[in-house]
Amino acid sequence: MNKTHRFLAFDCGATSGRALLGTFSGGVFSMEEVCRFPNRPLKRDGRLYWDLDSMRRSFMDCLTDLGSRGIKLDSIGIDTWGVDFGCIAPDGSLAGLPRAYRDPYTRGIPEEVFKIVPRTELYAATGIQIMDFNTIFQLYAQTRAGDPALEKAAGILFMPDLLAWTLTGRQVCEYTDASTSGMMDQKTRSFDKGLLERLGIRTDVLLPIVQPGTVIGPLKPQIAEQTGLGPVPVVAVAGHDTASAVAAVPAADERFAYLSSGTWSLMGIEVPAPIIDSRSQAANFTNEGGIEGTTRFLKNITGMWLLEQCREVWRKQGKDYSYPCLVRMARSEEAFPGRINPDDPRFAAPENMVEEILRCVQDDTLTDSQIVSCIYHSLADRYREVLGMLQGFAPFKIEKLHVIGGGSANELLNQWTADAIGMPVVAGPVEATAIGNLMLQAKAAGLISDRWEMRRLISASFPVRVFTPHTINNQ
């Protein structure tokens, strides 16, 4: 690693995206944010679509800026959210904008699918928890409606691959993102075409699956020239953002659980093979593809969504609480005994989150500080419950919980979580998704041998904080 290598990660979320530049030099890894851009769905004729042109322009602005600064890139990688896709026409053009998973057009579709493929059979094949917006339900809904983009499509590309296509003109289907679609047989790690054909879904539009680390191709000649970067290769990283984040967990061995903490919390373990049985289905666990052939066995938990929605209510009331202020408020009511179930469907999309919580606890006299304390304690308790479930499935003893993502910066919640679960919580890195993206590019370039070397380098490069149970937390 004596030569300096530079990689660019585009990390795109459902509301915003950013680009981060990773530098490897002399065995040291560093990272800096290059740009940040909004990502908002478009509403057309009552439908929600992703604004692919806007995202592409943001990519181009970033690449052009790097080129003007004389920065030479070894490669580029892209990660995004899962399930959504775009259709490519036979002439290689975009057949239509990709629909956004927030569009309610798949409401009620799973029940229609189960009339053809029973729920238990679908889970047994794919290992994916049932959610209305899973790709399989989107494709069924579009097929049934005679969607013109899908009807004329020669291929479909999931969002990371679609964005890579805008830069390279090459079409691939990356494994980790495909694994979340609800269409992939988790045992064969290929699309279950027999199942899809029973639903009338076209299988000729599905591309062969490639593994993370596959080089997709160089930037298109006109983009290479326009940006001044030259023919930089674009690499298929772990395209699903959670897969990239889990790749960046700074663990020393397999005996860990992870919590990717943000608006939603994703808690799981990394295992060598899918865990698919009646217990995992009943508990609504999902199996998603990880790097190096691993499986991310996990559960979706409502995360900071509860607090974010309360903040919106309070802001409209003229109370603009900062996050540090919210932490102080919760700490001041640490002994407050009230609890809610964060995953209760009543909290999915209430008109007023504060009022919904008050109704749930049956006490409309709660102060704002007590509500915040209730949310934090309830999340910590829910993490304990799910961790206990995970231990029942894990082929090893879970010894620590790694918290990654934006929520890992919340020291009070980390401490209360450690107290609740009775084991150490290792917090950080915050930018796990982008770091995982960059590390997989470095692995593709031959700078890193495997995920454990990757994790050792991350551990040495980014500070983490360890929270042990029952420690003093009044700092």
Give the residues covered by each predicted segment.
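Small/polar loops that bind or transfer phosphate-bearing groups
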Residues: 11, 98, 102, 134, ...
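Short beta-strand-loop/turn "lid" adjacent to the catalytic site in phosphate-handling enzymes
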Residues: 44, 68-102, 129-135, 160, ...
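Active-site core segments that coordinate phosphate-bearing ligands/cofactors
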Residues: 2, 8-9, 21, 107, ...
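N-terminal glycine/serine-rich phosphate-binding loop of ATP-dependent small-molecule kinases
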Residues: 1-96, 124, 152, 224-234, ...
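A conserved helix-loop-beta module that forms one wall/lid of the active-site cleft
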Residues: 196-212
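Glycine-rich beta-strand-to-loop/alpha-helix junction loops that act as flexible
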Residues: 79-82, 212-213, 261-264, 400-408
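Short glycine-rich phosphate-binding loop at a beta-alpha junction
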Residues: 72-80, 155, 208, 393-405
